[in-house]
């Protein structure tokens, strides 16, 4: 399934693997993902707790996060709220103009993952990713992001993602994507198409000069209830 996501503001991008823009990624410990292009290294700690009004709400809906004008200080839901056992297992980015695959990462099969001591596991492991891109990614016009995910034994109704990107707490762009219905115990694949407007040279230079001050919140809803919240930050300098 191929879908175009709406959004505005600035665009993200990745730097070349083999001459095309392609990133390296620093995921937090849990994913243990196998990268097919780019590289991985140890991330710094994710965002620290900074409670706000939304953390105190029992039910957070799309309208709550669409009103946010800066990055959240903490996660707005716990990992336990993913009662549908939604698990993202593969992610690929390609340049829509050239068709070049810029980046691809996947989780190894469960049988190949290292054993984990649950007592020592960070409850937020796997919810924060640090990306390292080159400046070329900021000049891409259209990028396709293919995601593959599985769901548990519950039907998933009205699955929706809202993703908001900020630079220095200024909203750059907001994307809103509807996955729709997912049947229980299924594996699903779809491609989001991101249309990026051109960025000013001044903004590009600022984003390059200030690595990891570009940040994003990804909110996932089922039946208009927040069930997952992931975070990321980005460097466009091309160096760790």
From Swiss-Prot:
Intracellular or extracellular location(s): Cytoplasm, Cytoskeleton, Microtubule organizing center, Centrosome; Cytoplasm, Cytoskeleton, Spindle; Cytoplasm, Cytoskeleton, Spindle pole
Bias (Low complexity): 13-23
Domain of life: Eukaryota
This protein's UniProt keywords: Cytoplasm, Cytoskeleton, Endocytosis, Lipid-binding, Phosphoprotein, Protein transport, Sensory transduction, Transport, Vision
GO cellular component, one term: centrosome
A GO molecular function held by the record: lipid binding
Residues recorded as bearing Phosphoserine in the entry: 37, 39, 41
Short name of any one Pfam family annotated for the protein: GMP_PDE_delta
GO process annotations (BP): endocytosis; lipoprotein transport; mitotic cytokinesis; negative regulation of caveolin-mediated endocytosis; negative regulation of clathrin-dependent endocytosis; nervous system development; visual perception
InterPro entries: Ig_E-set (IPR014756), PDE6D_unc-119_myristoyl-bd (IPR051519), PDED_dom (IPR008015), PDED_dom_sf (IPR037036)
Main subcellular localisation: cytoplasm
Biased composition (Gly residues): 1-12
Gene3D superfamilies: GMP phosphodiesterase, delta subunit (2.70.50.40)
Disordered: annotated span: 1-61
Entry PTM: Phosphorylation suppresses its interaction with KLHL18 and down-regulates its KLHL18-mediated degradation. Phosphorylated more under light conditions than dark conditions. Dephosphorylated by calcineurin.
Residues annotated for tetradecanoate binding in this entry: 131
Domain characteristics, as noted in the entry: Adopts an immunoglobulin-like beta-sandwich fold forming a hydrophobic cavity that captures N-terminally myristoylated target peptides. Phe residues within the hydrophobic beta sandwich are required for myristate binding.
Function comment: Involved in synaptic functions in photoreceptor cells, the signal transduction in immune cells as a Src family kinase activator, endosome recycling, the uptake of bacteria and endocytosis, protein trafficking in sensory neurons and as lipid-binding chaperone with specificity for a diverse subset of myristoylated proteins. Specifically binds the myristoyl moiety of a subset of N-terminally myristoylated proteins and is required for their localization. Binds myristoylated GNAT1 and is required for G-protein localization and trafficking in sensory neurons.
UniProt family annotation: Belongs to the PDE6D/unc-119 family.
Record's subunit section: Interacts with CABP4; in the absence of calcium. May interact with GTP-bound ARL1. Interacts with ARL2 and ARL3 (GTP-bound forms); this promotes the release of myristoylated cargo proteins. Found in a complex with ARL3, RP2 and UNC119; RP2 induces hydrolysis of GTP ARL3 in the complex, leading to the release of UNC119. Interacts with NPHP3 (when myristoylated). Interacts with CYS1 (when myristoylated). Interacts with MACIR; interaction only takes place when UNC119 is not liganded with myristoylated proteins. Interacts with LCK; this interaction plays a crucial role in activation of LCK.
UniProt protein name: Protein unc-119 homolog A
Protein's gene: UNC119
């Amino acid at each position: 399934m191929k879908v175009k996501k709406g959004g505005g503001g600035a665009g993200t991008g990745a730097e070349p693997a083999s001459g095309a823009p392609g990133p390296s990624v620093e995921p937090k410990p849990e994913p243990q993902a196998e990268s097919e292009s780019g590289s991985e290294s140890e991330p710094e700690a994710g965002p620290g707790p900074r409670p706000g009004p939304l953390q105190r709400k029992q039910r957070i809906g799309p309208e709550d996060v669409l009103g946010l004008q800066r990055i959240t200080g903490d996660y707005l839901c716990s990992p336990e709220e993913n009662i549908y056992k939604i698990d993202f297992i593969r992610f690929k980015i390609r340049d829509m103009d050239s068709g070049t695959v810029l980046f691809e990462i996947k989780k190894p099969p469960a049988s190949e993952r290292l054993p984990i001591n649950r007592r020592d596991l960070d409850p937020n492991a796997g919810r924060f990713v640090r990306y390292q891109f080159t400046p070329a990614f900021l000049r891409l016009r259209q990028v396709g992001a293919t995601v593959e995910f599985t769901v548990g034994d519950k039907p998933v109704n009205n699955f929706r993602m809202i993703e908001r990107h900020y630079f220095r707490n200024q909203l750059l762009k907001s994307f809103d994507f509807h996955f729709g219905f997912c049947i229980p115990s299924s594996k699903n694949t779809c491609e989001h198409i991101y249309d990026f407007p051109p960025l000013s040279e001044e903004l590009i230079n600022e984003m390059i000069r200030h690595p990891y001050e570009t940040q994003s919140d990804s909110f996932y809803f089922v039946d208009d209830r927040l069930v997952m919240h992931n975070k990321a930050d980005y460097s466009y300098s091309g160096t760790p």
